[in-house]
Amino acid sequence: MELVVGASEATMKSLLGKLGNLLAQEYALISGIRGDIQYINDELASMQAFLRDLSNVPEGHSHGHRMKDWMKQIRDIAYDVEDCIDDFAHRLPQDSISDAKWSFLLTKIYELWTWWPRRVIASNIAQLKVRAQQIADRRSRYGVNNPEHLDSSSSARTRAVNYEIAEYQVTSPQIIGIKEPVGMKTVMEELEVWLTNPQAENGQAVLSIVGFGGVGKTTIATALYRKVSEKFQCRASVAVSQNYDQGKVLNSILSQVSNQEQGSSTTISEKKNLTSGAKSMLKTALSLLRGNCICQPENDGNPDNTPIRLQETTDDDQNPRKLEQLLAEKSYILLIDDIWSAETWESIRSILPKNNKGGRIIVTTRFQAVGSTCSPLETDRLHTVDFLTDDESQNLFNTSICESKIRKDSNKVDEQVPEEIWKICGGLPLAIVSMAGLVACNPRKACCDWSKLCKSLFPEQETPLTLDGVTRILDCCYNDLPADLKTCLLYLSIFPKGWKISRKRLSRRWIAEGFANEKQGLTQERVAEAYFNQLTRRNLVRPMEHGSNGKVKTFQVHDMVLEYIMSKSIEENFITVVGGHWQMTAPSNKVRRLSMQSSGSNRGSSTKGLNLAQVRSLTVFGNLNHVPFHSFNYGIIQVLDLEDWKGLKERHMTEICQMLLLKYLSIRRTEISKIPSKIQKLEYLETLDIRETYVRDLPKSIVQLKRIISILGGNKNTRKGLRLPQEKSKKPIKNPSPQGKTKEPAKKGFLSQEKGKGAMKALRVLSGIEIVEESSEVAAGLHQLTGLRKLAIYKLNITKGGDTFKQLQSSIEYLGSCGLQTLAINDENSEFINSLGDMPAPPRYLVALELSGKLEKLPKWITSITTLNKLTISVTVLRTETLEILHILPSLFSLTFAFSLSAAKQDQDIIKDILENNKLDSDGEIVIPAEGFKSLKLLRFFAPLVPKLSFLDKNAMPALEIIEMRFKDFEGLFGIEILENLREVHLKVSDGAEAITKFLVNDLKVNTEKPKVFVDGIVTA
């Protein structure tokens, strides 16, 4: 079937649940409309069954415009009914009366109080019933046949099956390594030599990489960029695409180069101020921490990994001159991905400075003519990417299947999988990995079924593969998805091309949209994670970064996959994109989910002509000048994602507080400094993301949000925390003690029962808060958050023995017994984290622990936490003895030793003494124990000085895959060649490194064949 039914069926499924709940609320229904609601419920249930049957109809059966129009009517009435039900839930609140013991009098009072809104809703429901009747009649009147009348005996196409949610969930923590392009070893070596050829240093040279969409151009260009970037003084990468925006491209390049310039200025300052060695070292340490230590911020969007704020503060008219000044006397390399026209290249070239320092530009394009325009000179180079050979295709197919399988021991491909599957892909990597994901997720499918599938997809056996052929393959993979996963996949079309999408951000949005609900005993969060794992296994999304817990941190959607799902979303009116990288036709019907993206010279992303009155979800990307808040119906919007939008003003927050059904609100990295007290009106709010804003205090009314699940605040990079509300009783307590003395005013927890019954009981994540000496009420209030699963304190500055100290210790101990899974504390004076070991009851459910500060010793109970997966502790406890204690932890996936911000504030001599004493305690070197660390895959060290580390036994950390180090001084890494599973070592050298450090780094890189050693930073001695 060509029709899109996934999102419609999922919408219907959610709606039927709401109708069922409404029918159960007898007291809220007006006499006479129960029958109408029951009729609508039954009719929509039949429509849902029709849609489900429709999704299983074999390919080749199409009803043309009649079926599409009828499905559009089903979709529209489903959306309108859902709006009506949501309005019903809001206008007839139940929380305040659900516990009341209803009497006849109370019932009459309630009916009188809600008479008018119930009448309005009754009228709307009656109209919807009439529409449902008309839609049902229209289907038979115009000959829209039932799916069972069609030939459904064919098994040629893959069908969506009812996967168990448990199957989605089975996954193990992983680390993303750096993968080389398949079949490109020789070519990569040649291109790498060309890019670094000293004979061409007299001027700018351009490498154009041309090829069919999905053939791997960006993969090759990115691999080259990564390999050679350390040999250039400046570097930047940017995505362009069809809707080219010169200002955006220029700002992105400028911000990346400016950031590098600011980093290099530290070295110049050091050379000019040799007498101020202590300050210099401290300054460098702080710089290292703010950029790259345990407080490394997530990148949830910007595809070029560039600071957003700098882009907003630059003057467009001055930017070309600024870029020319920055690059005038420097060698540079630029990666410009996905150029669509010669005009776009000419525009880009006009803003790039020319010098005689050997500038290199790598461009990718689908079009040979564009590639020739970009590389017209003899000093330039044009490389066309060919399709893979049969051997390369089979190797990629087999490798992808093994990576997509659930079980760890699934390291070979079943012999029953016919070779036709990878042969129909025509050597196109995107098609090959997509089909591999399909095969891996259908292990019970017989060989004959796969052969029939291949013949049905390509009965004409066409070669080479065309764009239509790629679409057929993607259709096949899409149609195999269950309805829930189809909806989740289509939702990704909200994000711009090339965007690095945060998995957590996406999961929270899925939950707010109602796409991931509790199922088979799993929470919404676990279901969302399971859905994402399934999309990853099917190779429909590409993980880009893994967090230190082994879960995907950020991912991307391949350009061709994004184009495909965007076309499906438009067909079903599921997502509407304004602006963006591609030219899209505006929908003629109502907009439900709006994605506004800056593009071209039009930063307003005009919504003229669109019906925005029924927008339920609004997302803003880029530097938009205007968002038409006045056009929205505040009573409908449930998801509002304004992350990084610098146009957000304080007055907008007042309007946002009128969006009474809002479930998800993100104003992360905006200029907002205050949250209005009226936020308490958002009684359905589940996620509040105010990270990296100027908001320092939450209003007292925040405790009225009974459904809030996640509060995300503060700035992990700068360790600025969010202050929770607190208050004191004004009247002193008279004669409370036998001595007859008057005590100080009694302190209440900020979540005291007087704030409202059940305040914030749903809260699961509280991240980025600040607790200081005056925060005893906050410390006491944490005790009441018994559902808390994550607590992150970005700033802790309290005195040992004080009231706040005792309250916090008591709260953490209690929360640990209630199921706390993640605990992160940045202790500025280190007294609290050093006292944690004395807790009588350890937090036995911990999965992740982060202790930042001048930690003196490990907590005594740490070896009893068998569930611990991620551990981040201060480098001040880096000793051989520490590793000998930790090596017995059975589930530990990542171990990080970091140089904490609090330690960096100490005198240089104290810092040096701590590190030197650690070495002496370990006999001059840190030796990794020969046994233990059975599950450890990631080992990291972030410090100004990394002492000598030695692996003396091949059984030391047997599962270790990646070592990361960031430092200014380095004393060597020995024995890594004997570690069988170690794949990569990443070294980041801070500015101002000594000659001996550069020598050791170069020696390690040059003389180590396995594992691969990657260096970030200029290390030529």
Swiss-Prot record:
Q: Quote the Gene3D superfamilies the UniProt record gives.
A: 1.20.5.4130, Helical domain of apoptotic protease-activating factors, P-loop containing nucleotide triphosphate hydrolases, Ribonuclease Inhibitor, Winged helix-like DNA-binding domain superfamily/Winged helix DNA-binding domain
Q: What keyword terms does UniProt attach to this protein?
A: ATP-binding, Coiled coil, Leucine-rich repeat, Nucleotide-binding, Plant defense, Repeat
Name of a matching Pfam family? NB-ARC
Query: Is Repeat among the key words of this record?
Result: yes
Give induction info: By M.oryzae pathogen infection.
Q: Which one of the record's GO molecular function terms can you name?
A: ADP binding
What are the start and end residues of each LRR repeat? 612-634, 659-682, 683-705, 785-807, 817-841, 843-865, 866-888, 912-935, 957-981
Give a GO biological-process term. Answer: defense response
Query: Where does the NB-ARC domain lie?
Result: 186-519
Q: State the residue spans of region: Disordered.
A: 297-317, 719-751
On whether Cell division is a keyword of this UniProt record, the answer is no
* Tissues in which the UniProt entry reports expression: Constitutively expressed.
Among InterPro entries, the record links this protein to: Apaf_helical (IPR042197), Disease_R_plants (IPR044974), LRR_dom_sf (IPR032675), LRR_R13L4/SHOC2-like (IPR055414), NB-ARC (IPR002182), P-loop_NTPase (IPR027417), RX-like_CC (IPR038005), Rx_N (IPR041118)
Question: Region Structured coiled coil (CC) domain: what ranges?
Answer: 1-182
Q: What does this protein do?
A: Disease resistance (R) protein. Resistance proteins guard the plant against pathogens that contain an appropriate avirulence protein via an indirect interaction with this avirulence protein. That triggers a defense system including the hypersensitive response, which restricts the pathogen growth. Contribution of Pikm-1 is required to recognize the effector avirulence protein AVR-Pik.
The similarity annotation says: Belongs to the disease resistance NB-LRR family.
Q: What is this protein called?
A: Disease resistance protein Pikm2-TS
* Source organism per UniProt: Oryza sativa subsp. japonica (Rice)
